[in-house]
Amino acid sequence: MSRKKIKNPLIKRIPKEIIGDWKKYLVVFLFLVLTIGFVSGMYVANDSMLTSADEGVSKYKQEDGHFELKDKADSELVTAIESGEVKTAPDEKDSDSSKTPVTLYENFYRNETEDYDADGKKDGTIRVYTKTEDINLACLVKGSFPQNENEIAVDRMHADNVGMKVGDTIKVSGKEFEVSGLIAYVNYSTLHEKKTDMMFDAIKFDVAMVTKEGFDRLDKSIHYTYAWKYKDEPADDIEQKEKSDDFLEAMVSQVMAAGNEVEDYTPRYSNPAINFATDDMGSDKAMGGVLLDILIVIIAFIFAVTISNTIANESSAIGTLRASGYTKGELIRHYLSMPVIVTFLAAVVGNILGYTVFKDVVVGMYYIKQGLGQRFGQLGLANARGAKEQEAADGSIGVSDTGAAAQD
C-alpha cells in the first residue's frame, strides 16, 4: 500500500507538466503528426499506385517494347519477325541467340502540329494514334472516345496543363477536330516524346487518339511502329534484358534480309514514357523513409534538450523525491513519460491522417505532376479514395473502345 502512495504523486505530475509546457509539446506534437502523416500517406499511396501499375500492364495490354521500320512490313516479314529466329546466310554460322517468339501489333502514328488555342500558330507536337483493341490501350478519364473522323481524344495531363477541355475545337496540322474526351495511354505514364529525353514535356508534347477515318485526314508521314509481346513472359528484369537482346538480333536480321530498315528500337525497360513514373514513385518512397528517420532524430534531440532543461529546473524537487525514496530509474521513467506520450499520440493521429487524408494528397500530387490518369492510377486512386470511385471508373472504361475492360 505504501508503495502505491509513493507512486501516485509522480503520476499526477504528468498532466500538470504537459499543461505547464503545452505550447512546446503542442508544436512537437503537430510536427510529428505532419511528418508521420505525410510519410505514412506516401507509403500507402505509392504502394497502391505501384500495384495498379503492375496490374495495368496486363489489363491495358502494355507492350514489351516497340520498333519502327522505314517501310511498312508485309505479312511475310511480320511472320518472320514473330518467329524470333535469326536470319543467317547459307555460308554463315548459326547465331548463339535463343529463339524469342513474339506477337507483333501495328501501332502506327503520325507526329502532327498542334494548335490548341486556335491562334494559327504551332503550340507543340501531337502524336496521333488510331483506336485499337490489341495493344497499348488507353483509359478514358473524361468524355468519350472519338466516334467519327472529326473527333479526337487527347492526353489528360496535357489538357490540364494547357487548359483544354472536352468540347473544345483544336487544329491538328490545320485540320479541325473536336475534343471528345481526355484519355491516358498505358504506354505514356509520362509524356516523353523521345526515349533520350531526360524529362517529359506535358505542354509542348501531346498524344491523342482518332478514328481510322480521322487518321486518314492527316498528312504527315506515318511512323511504321510495331509493338511486340513475348510469347513467354520474362520472369524478371534480367530475363527481359536477355530476351530483348535476342529479339533485337533476330528482328534486325529479318528486316535486313527483307530489304527494309530499322529506324528505332525501344524495349519496355528502357522506355522512359513507361518507367519514369514508377521509378519516380519508388525513389520518392525511399526518400520519404530517409526523411522520416532524419526528422525522428531531430525530434529525439529536441526531447533530450527539453528533458535536460526540465531536470535542471526541477533539481531541488528531484532531490526531495530522491530523499522520499524514489529511485533513479523511477525518476528517469517519469521524465521520459511525457515525450513518450506525446510521440505515441502523434504516431496514432499521424497514421490515421496518413491513411485517410494524406494519401489523397500524395495521389493528387502525382496526378497533377505526372500523366497518371486512371490507366495508371485507377487502382491507386481507387485504393486511396475508396471503392465507390473505383466502381464509377470501371463503369466508364467498360464501354470504351480502347480501354476494352469488358474484353479483359
Where do the language-model regions lie?
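Short, composition-biased linear "edge" segments at structural boundaries
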Residues: 402-408
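Membrane transport/envelope proteins' first extracytoplasmic loop
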Residues: 2-300, 309, 328-329, 364, ...
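Interfacial "coupling" helices/loops that link adjacent transmembrane helices in transporter permeases
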Residues: 13, 19-21, 301-340
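Short, intrinsically disordered low-complexity segments enriched in Ser/Thr with adjacent Pro
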Residues: 380-389
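A short glycine-centered flexible hinge/capping loop motif at secondary-structure junctions
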Residues: 325-326, 346, 350, 389
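Small-residue-rich transmembrane alpha-helices
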Residues: 304-309, 314-316, 340-371, 378
